[in-house]
Amino acid sequence: MSFRTIEWRDDKVIMIDQTRLPGEEVYCEYGDYKSVAEAIRGMIIRGAPAIGVAAAMGVALGAREIIADTHESFLRQLDNVCDVLARTRPTAVNLFWAIERMKRVAADNCGGSLDEVREVLKAEAIRIEEEDLALCKAIGRHGAGLIPEGATVLTHCNAGGLATAGYGTALGVIRAAHEAGKNIQVFADETRPWLQGARLTAWELMKDGIPVTLISDNMAGFFMKRGEITCCVVGADRIAANGDTANKIGTYSVAVLAKENNIPFYVAAPTSTLDLSLENGDQIPIEERHAREVTHLQGLPVAPEGIAVRNPAFDVTPARYIAGIITEKGVITGDYTAKLKALVKP
């Protein structure tokens, strides 16, 4: 790919500003954990795996800001850093997975000097980024076989390189199928209200030379009924133990329409997106965002002033609508409760 979503460079975190795409390809530099937290909250970086990487790098930056005389004081202050990052966005479990991993690494390496702990945390954050890229490539390899020759694939939101350390989950499957020589095309839902499909997915696929057609969200059923959609592939922000999946708002509607039209609906996600502590999707916390995201577009009002607004950022697709969950370890179908549990066994 010709862009980098996030990287550690010269003890700074560099991110592409996704709020300014597709008009401008601008990279932002962050040298402290609070600014990384604001970047996550403000969706300069978004997508569950990507914000997990960002949170890990934020912890590494925060460790460098801590002034402490003892390991105990260092770990207490690091907990505060982690709390700030954890409060940014509540739904994507990768955020919390990455933070907990960084906390464990810090605790396990407190036998050396504090400077050594800081270096270990930096190395771990970079390792999380590198692992995510490798996981996405593996997801792509496992999922590519599900995409038939000549397929038209519908995707919702952006689960591409911009949502990960690179390559993508849902778009990773599409990329891998394209790289295998399959003649495929993509229909991208625009994905209101943030327009991740229009601004980000369309931009990514066009840069890669993969044929893509943009549609508004309420057109998906029309094209499904006409037989123009072969399958659907989306990403995930959190997957409960029974396979219920939280993803960008509107995903549930796509899944229901796909089921009605006998179109397979696949979820692509790394195992770090699994939350087996939750029995089902009803327990997944759903982030509600500011009304202005709905009432304004590109800074201009598109609704009457003072109108009541609801703006959940995610919805939950019940497992019964999902034909398969594509992970870096393979494709899971059928009894998700048993198979997901087996998937993460050490």
Swiss-Prot record:
Example of a GO MF term: S-methyl-5-thioribose-1-phosphate isomerase activity
Active site: 237 (proton donor)
Recorded catalytic activity of this chain's protein: 5-(methylsulfanyl)-alpha-D-ribose 1-phosphate = 5-(methylsulfanyl)-D-ribulose 1-phosphate
HAMAP family: Salvage_MtnA
Any Gene Ontology biological process: L-methionine salvage from methylthioadenosine
UniProt family annotation: Belongs to the eIF-2B alpha/beta/delta subunits family. MtnA subfamily.
Residues reported in the UniProt entry to bind substrate: 46-48, 89, 196, 247-248
Site keyed Transition state stabilizer: positions: 157
Top-level division of the source organism's lineage: Bacteria
Record bears the keyword Magnesium: no
Name listed for the protein in its UniProt record: Methylthioribose-1-phosphate isomerase
E.C. designation(s): 5.3.1.23
Function, in words: Catalyzes the interconversion of methylthioribose-1-phosphate (MTR-1-P) into methylthioribulose-1-phosphate (MTRu-1-P).
